[in-house]
Structure formats: structure tokens, C-alpha cells
A protein has these predicted regions:
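Helix-centered, glycine/charged polyanion-binding patches within enzymatic domains
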Residues: 61, 65-66, 71-150, 154
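Composition- and surface-driven signal marking solvent-exposed, interaction-prone regions
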Residues: 45, 146-149, 172-175
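Residue-level detector of intrinsically disordered/flexible regions characterized by low predicted structural confidence
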Residues: 6-14, 20-21, 30, 97, ...
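Short, surface-exposed, charge-dense and proline/glycine-enriched linear segments
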Residues: 16-17, 101-105, 171-175
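Polybasic low-complexity intrinsically disordered regions
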Residues: 1-85, 90, 157-163
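C-terminal domain-tail junction helix/linker
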Residues: 157-160, 164-175
Length: 175
């Protein structure tokens, strides 16, 4: 339950969201990760009911030429607040993974090409998941311990900064 505290009150800043058939109550961390180094450059913490695509423009630094994301970011380039060009005036390409149901259209050959492209996108996007793996696995951060968005932001800023230190200390796997 979301009210396991002394006051028997819910956190006013946290919200519920349904993912699949499972309900979650709390917060969501949206992160921007550098494609080459795998280090976090941006962290935004919101209530769990805030959709990923609404945070896209807040996660970009302005230096990007390509943006990768999971299917939660579909349509990010079409939004009013979308950043279309970076600081140097170059067009930003959005490479967002499709939903599995969208990959069933077309011939077998086109499906094979589509599957290969989606795999390439996922291999770059996996660097984001590695960061969450460090925070959840190494630091055992699986649920919130504090009430209030400000406390969550402080806690997650510390955890993701420590994750950056750990990831920066590891030898580069791509080389």
C-alpha cells in the first residue's frame, strides 16, 4: 500500500500510474545519457503519471544530433515544444524504438530490415538502462523512502551522480 507510514497519509506529490496490468505509485526519473560515454547529463524527476514524451525537450542539452528513446518517446519530434535543431543549427534526428505491434506490418524482407534497425536503436538506448541497473542493482534503490518531490529529487540527484562516478571509472566497453 502507498500509506505505510506513521500518519497513514499518501504523498501529495506522488501519483498512480498503470503500466500493463500493474499499478505503480510514486515518482519517475527521466534521464538524458551521452551516447558515447554512457554518462548522465540530465535528470528530471516527476510524479509517476507524467508521460515520458512530455519530458523530451527538458532532457536535451542542445548539442545532440541524434536522439534515441524507447517507445514511450514516440511522437517526440512532432510536439510543439520539440527541439528540432541543436545549438549549431543542425537538424536533430529522432530515432525512437517502435512498439512491437507496429513491427508486424509489411513483407518478411521489410520486417527483417525493420528488426535490424530496431536492434541498432536498442543497442544505443541500452546505455540508459545500464545507468538504471547501477542505481537499482548496486545501490538497491527500488522504492522511495521519503515523501515529497523535493526530497526525491535530492535523493535521485545523489544516486545518479554516484552512478556517473562508477560508470566513469569503468573501462570503456566500446573500445
Amino acid at each position: 500500500s502507498s500509506t505505510k507510514n506513521k500518519d497513514k497519509k499518501r504523498d501529495k506529490d506522488a501519483h498512480s500510474v498503470k503500466k500493463g496490468n500493474q499499478w505503480h505509485f510514486g515518482y519517475k526519473a527521466h534521464i538524458g545519457v551521452d551516447k558515447d560515454s554512457g554518462l548522465i547529463h540530465t535528470l528530471k524527476v516527476t510524479a509517476a503519471n507524467v508521460h515520458d514524451v512530455t519530458m523530451t525537450s527538458k532532457l536535451l542539452t542542445g548539442e545532440e544530433t541524434v536522439v534515441y528513446g524507447d517507445s514511450g518517446y514516440l511522437g517526440a519530434e512532432k510536439r510543439e515544444d520539440a527541439i528540432i535543431t541543436n545549438h549549431s543549427g543542425k537538424h536533430i534526428r529522432y530515432k525512437i524504438n517502435r512498439r512491437p505491434s507496429q513491427m508486424k506490418k509489411g513483407s518478411a524482407r521489410s520486417q527483417a530490415q525493420l528488426k535490424r534497425r530496431e536492434h541498432e536503436k536498442s543497442s544505443v538506448r541500452a546505455k540508459v538502462e545500464h545507468v538504471f541497473g547501477v542505481v537499482k542493482g548496486l545501490f538497491r534503490y527500488r522504492k522511495t523512502r521519503y515523501r515529497g518531490l523535493r526530497k526525491q529529487i535530492a535523493k535521485l540527484n545523489m544516486l545518479f551522480a554516484l552512478a556517473n562516478l562508477i560508470l566513469a571509472d569503468r573501462p570503456c566497453l566500446a573500445a
